[in-house]
């Protein structure tokens, strides 16, 4: 009886280990057609993007997942811990909120940066970047944080007086409801008047991603439609 129980115990242990390994095993490219239908990427682009994902995910730790440092190095050419913009983009990519990116998260979120992504998606994503507190509107302090961070990362030094003046003008134009905050509708109107606000929302190389890994793309298992 004891031997039987011990055998069951060992079997359970093996099963638990298998389950644990399965849970930790990152998901790869399971169905490029699904991602192609649900993003702006073609099937070939999804497959090429997966090759890019594998390179990025092995830059620091070769685990098939992208951590924040790998993400910043790949997309922003920096691993600065204080990069607020990069932090915000990573947090919005990380829909599972576990500090790492699987391929599907990476592909779906990166889709908004494609040159062919709908303008409304870019506007919505950029709004979320500035909505640091995730309240559904942008406050003055949030704008200041992003402006200060952007200036610091670009090596520009402006006095606090000049920065406050920039924010004053921004709210004077954007806050048409005069309630001290910028909601989604006001943000959209502001961006439409000043498209340059979205210049960071487009990564041109995504349009040419299939030429980055031509040998892989030529062997696509599914034809683009």
From Swiss-Prot:
Pfam families: EF-hand_7, EF-hand_8. It comes from the Eukaryota. Keywords: Repeat. One of its GO terms (biological process) is calcium-mediated signaling. GO terms for molecular function: calcium ion binding; kinase binding. The record marks 154 as: Involved in dimerization. Residues 45-80, 81-116, 118-153, 162-197 form the EF-hand domain. InterPro entries: CNBL1-10, EF-hand-dom_pair, EF_hand_dom. Belongs to the calcineurin regulatory subunit family. Acts as a calcium sensor. CBL proteins interact with CIPK serine-threonine protein kinases. Binding of a CBL protein to the regulatory NAF domain of a CIPK protein lead to the activation of the kinase in a calcium-dependent manner. Homodimer. May interact with CIPK31. This is Calcineurin B-like protein 3. It comes from Oryza sativa subsp. japonica.
């Amino acid at each position: 009886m004891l031997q039987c129980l011990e055998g069951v115990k060992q079997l359970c242990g093996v099963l638990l280990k298998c389950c644990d390994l399965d849970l930790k095993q990152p998901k790869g490219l399971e169905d490029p057609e699904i991602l192609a239908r649900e993003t702006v990427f073609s099937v070939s682009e999804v497959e090429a993007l997966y090759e890019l994902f594998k390179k990025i995910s092995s830059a620091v730790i070769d685990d098939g997942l992208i951590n924040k440092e790998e993400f910043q190095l790949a997309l922003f050419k920096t691993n600065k811990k204080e990069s607020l913009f990069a932090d915000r983009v990573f947090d919005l990519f990380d829909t599972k909120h576990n500090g790492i990116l699987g391929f599907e998260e990476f592909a779906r979120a990166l889709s908004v940066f494609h040159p062919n992504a709908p303008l409304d998606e870019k506007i919505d994503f950029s709004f979320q970047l500035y909505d640091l507190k995730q309240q559904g509107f942008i406050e003055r302090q949030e704008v200041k944080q992003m402006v200060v961070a952007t200036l610091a990362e670009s090596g520009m030094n402006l006095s606090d007086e000049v920065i406050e003046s920039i924010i004053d003008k921004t709210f004077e134009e954007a806050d048409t409801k005069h309630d001290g905050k910028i909601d989604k509708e006001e943000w959209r109107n502001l961006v439409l008047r000043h498209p340059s606000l979205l210049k960071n929302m487009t990564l041109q190389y995504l349009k040419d991603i299939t030429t980055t890994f031509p040998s892989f793309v030529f062997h696509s298992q599914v034809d683009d439609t």
